[in-house]
Structures are given as C-alpha cells and as structure tokens.
Amino acid sequence: MARTGYSATIEGENVARAKANELPVSPKHSIEIARFIKNMTTTEAKAYLTDVVALKKAIPFKRFNRNVAHKRGLSKWPAGRYPVKAAEAYIRLLESVEKNAEYIGLDVENLRIDHAAANTGRGLRAFFPRAMGRATPKRRETVNIEIVVTEVA
C-alpha cells in the first residue's frame, strides 16, 4: 500500500487529525457523511451518527441522490438515507481523532471538525466462477477517510 498524505494542509498547535485507509465502505455514502459532519463538533457528530446507526435520523443525500426517497426528519433537504456501515466507520474515526487530540493536550469537548473528506481507495478485484468455464469480474470498493479537527476556545 502506498503512503498517502492528507488532502488538506491545516497546521497549528491546536490541530489533531486521523485517517483510515481502504475501508470496505461505500465511497458515495462516505462522501455524503463527510459533507454533512463538516463544521460540527465531534460530540454532535458522534451523537448524530449513533442515531443514524440506530435508524432514527437520516443523512441528507445532496450529490448521490438519484432514486433516493424522502426521509422524515430532514429539514432543508428531503432526500436521504441511513448509511449504517459508513456511519460506524466515521464513529471509529471520530473516536480516534479525539484520542489523538487528548494525547497532544487539547480539550476534547471543544473540538470542531474543520476538514472531513472521503476518497475512493484501491479496488480489490476477484472473479465469480460461472458455468461453461466462464468468469465474471467483481470489484470491491474501498474508501480512504480523513478528519482534521481544531480546538475552539
């Protein structure tokens, strides 16, 4: 696996960051969650994503919303979904960035998400064996997720 950096260069004493590479999660769901949690605090984002996993609140889908039904509880955008697997990955990454912030001496209660991004990772290729000696290719999608938080006074 190649070494990859962060897509945003946010430097400073009150900055913590975390990254997860090649997670077996949908890139489209990850991009929508990253757009939604940007500029939230980490506690707000974790609480909302926990409700998404419990199917109580939906994530609004603004970009990848073809044939997406309206969901109850979305105020400004009607189309949405419950991306449970991607939300669980983001919860783990938010816990990681909070631990990183605590390690460098930041206050965990005052962390704001300044940068959240999801990029497609490496596609893992395999084949479905078929009848008559044929084979159909399959490709498993992966995603790289990164979060950068800053301490707000």
Swiss-Prot record:
GO terms for cellular component: cytosolic large ribosomal subunit. CDD domains: Ribosomal_L22. Pfam families: Ribosomal_L22. InterPro entries: Ribosomal_uL22, Ribosomal_uL22_CS, Ribosomal_uL22_euk/arc, Ribosomal_uL22_sf. GO terms for biological process: cytoplasmic translation. GO terms for molecular function: rRNA binding; structural constituent of ribosome. Keywords: Ribonucleoprotein, Ribosomal protein, RNA-binding, rRNA-binding. Part of the 50S ribosomal subunit. NCBIfam families: PRK04223.1, uL22_arch_euk. Belongs to the universal ribosomal protein uL22 family. This protein binds specifically to 23S rRNA. It makes multiple contacts with different domains of the 23S rRNA in the assembled 50S subunit and ribosome. The globular domain of the protein is located near the polypeptide exit tunnel on the outside of the subunit, while an extended beta-hairpin is found that lines the wall of the exit tunnel in the center of the 70S ribosome. This is Large ribosomal subunit protein uL22.
